[in-house]
């Protein structure tokens, strides 16, 4: 019976950056760390210059003839690139309005489920529309719906702030929450400092 083929459990090989000794081109156009053009020099000379600066020789344009390298701190460069990529990804996120629906007579378990949903939406950077739905004569209990939404705003005060207070909209009571820009602790400290300043005057 032929042996069973073995599964290759090794992690996929990551592509290593073209820096220092990994650069194999004999001639390179080199730019110094301060932007000065060092011209076309040999690979060995470029590596010596980078080593003297205690920096890295990084291949920045492989398609050029000869390839272009820059002398830089590669660790710092990589960190800045990753930081820019994260910021770009954050800016590219388009804010959506997610809706959380409930009845004013909602039980505690279902209420906590709605709180969890709203928290996830807010942490993803989206606004949340909290809607209490009335059926038939339930419309008489708008005060209970308003109290429920006020409780929700309080329970979500850490990740959110109220953009629009509870109000009637047709047969529903709605409230809009938006992700909090100022951390709650910082905001409380600012209010406390403002209160102290008033007492001092």
Curated annotation (Swiss-Prot):
Keywords: Cytoplasm, Initiation factor, Protein biosynthesis. Gene3D superfamilies: Translation initiation factor 3 (IF-3), C-terminal domain, Translation initiation factor 3 (IF-3), N-terminal domain. SUPFAM superfamilies: Translation initiation factor IF3, C-terminal domain (SSF55200), Translation initiation factor IF3, N-terminal domain (SSF54364). GO terms for biological process: ribosome disassembly. One of its GO terms (molecular function) is translation initiation factor activity. GO terms for cellular component: cytosol; membrane. InterPro entries: T_IF-3_C_sf, T_IF-3_N_sf, Translation_initiation_fac3_CS, Translation_initiation_fac_3, Translation_initiation_fac_3_C, Translation_initiation_fac_3_N. PANTHER family: TRANSLATION INITIATION FACTOR IF-3, TRANSLATION INITIATION FACTOR IF-3, MITOCHONDRIAL. Monomer. Belongs to the IF-3 family. IF-3 binds to the 30S ribosomal subunit and shifts the equilibrium between 70S ribosomes and their 50S and 30S subunits in favor of the free subunits, thus enhancing the availability of 30S subunits on which protein synthesis initiation begins. This is Translation initiation factor IF-3. The lineage of its organism: Bacteria, Bacillati, Cyanobacteriota, Cyanophyceae, Synechococcales. The gene is infC.
